């Protein structure tokens, strides 16, 4: 049996829950999925509750919980550090939605939140797509002097049926805002060209 803990079941957390359930079914694996939630009274997205074994708001009874094979941290970015601290040592592997912490938390020492040897994956998949891998393989030996990346996105379209003004993506203090929430572009730029020496924000 595969055991998984979900911290945060908004749109992306629910998608990961449904995907994991489907993958386990395809592979003939039994799945126990639990959810650590901030508010049990808040309704889940359609179909999510049926896929969960248990829901709770605290880990105080963690002795009664299984040691999880996998934990998904998919709550608002500003709460990731707190979640990592709460579940420290409770899961063999971690799936952390990007980015790990918000812009206001860049002084967080991740070594205090992740035990030595902890397996963790941050969801920044664009660097692994075929086009990016081909470009990265083509770059060695070249001396690029300029790169232009354009990213167009319309926040009201991100979560159909949800008022975009109420979600963390619309609030910098919660880890939202274009500079940090659209981190995929920054991630693959750094992967391709290295860490920038200077960053300018032109408004």
Protein language model regions, located:
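A contiguous active-site-proximal alpha/beta segment in oxidoreductase catalytic domains
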Residues: 101-158
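N-terminal Rossmann-like dinucleotide-binding module
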Residues: 1-51, 66
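Short beta->alpha connector loops
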Residues: 10-12, 76-79, 100-101, 126-129
């Amino acid at each position: 049996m595969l055991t998984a803990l979900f911290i945060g079941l908004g749109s992306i957390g629910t998608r990961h829950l449904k995907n994991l359930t489907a993958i386990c079914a395809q592979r003939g694996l039994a799945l126990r999925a639990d959810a650590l939630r901030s508010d049990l009274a808040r309704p889940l997205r359609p179909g999510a509750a049926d896929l969960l074994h248990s829901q709770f708001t605290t880990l105080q009874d963690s002795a009664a919980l299984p040691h999880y094979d996998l934990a998904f941290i998919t709550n608002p970015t500003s709460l990731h550090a707190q979640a990592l601290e709460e579940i420290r040592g409770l899961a063999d592997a971690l799936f952390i939605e990007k980015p790990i912490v918000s812009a206001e938390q860049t002084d967080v020492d991740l070594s205090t939140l992740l035990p030595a040897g902890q397996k963790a994956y941050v969801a920044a998949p664009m660097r692994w797509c075929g086009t990016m891998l081909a470009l990265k393989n083509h770059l060695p030996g070249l001396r690029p002097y300029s790169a232009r990346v354009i990213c167009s996105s319309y926040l009201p379209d991100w979560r159909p049926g949800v008022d975009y003004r109420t979600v963390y993506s619309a609030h910098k203090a919660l880890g939202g805002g274009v500079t940090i929430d659209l981190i995929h572009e920054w991630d693959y730029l750094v992967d391709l060209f290295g860490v920038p020496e200077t960053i300018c924000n032109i408004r």
